[in-house]
């Protein structure tokens, strides 16, 4: 199709749907029934899995969204991983413009649709929801079944709303 670039070394299942514009990098894998709606960059070695839907996204190299994920209007950093069924919610339920909330500050985006921004090496647990405008710092873990909003600092473990701890050095 038009405006679709797929690296020769990438693997795309015959049942995957890809709409342009889209770039799929070297050694990336687009699995069975993946649904790429367009405006997507899938980095080198990234995995877009079974029944995962992408729209208006940048997936940096080695990102994994391997099982039943929705990632819309979002940026996922190097080697970030979203567990099965985790999603980026990109529209507020009251349909107002998305704001990013960080350390008591409110940053207006001017956007009706904005998902999440994940730093490098973020691990999102299964079944988690990243609410519109969520920003997660590098090297952070999100526990399964979490509903995350606002800013989560780099090097954290997000256990639940109001319970975020700093990772211990290894």
List where the protein language model places each region.
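The repeat-register position in solenoid repeat domains
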Residues: 25-26, 31, 44, 55, ...
């Amino acid at each position: 199709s038009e405006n679709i670039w797929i690296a020769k070394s990438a693997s795309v299942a015959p049942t995957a749907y890809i709409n342009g514009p889209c770039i799929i990098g070297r050694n990336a894998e687009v699995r069975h029934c993946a649904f790429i709606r367009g405006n997507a960059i899938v980095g080198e070695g990234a995995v877009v899995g079974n029944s995962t839907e992408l729209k208006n996204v940048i997936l940096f190299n080695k990102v994994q969204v391997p099982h039943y994920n929705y990632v819309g209007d979002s940026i996922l950093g190097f080697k970030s991983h979203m567990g099965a069924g985790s999603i980026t919610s990109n529209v507020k339920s009251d349909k107002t413009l998305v704001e990013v909330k960080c350390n008591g500050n409110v940053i207006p985006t001017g956007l009706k649709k904005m998902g999440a921004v994940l730093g490098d090496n973020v691990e999102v647990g299964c079944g988690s929801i990243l609410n519109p405008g969520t920003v997660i710092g590098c090297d952070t873990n999100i526990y399964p079944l979490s509903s995350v909003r606002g800013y989560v600092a780099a090097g954290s473990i997000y256990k639940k709303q109001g319970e975020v701890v700093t990772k211990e050095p290894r």
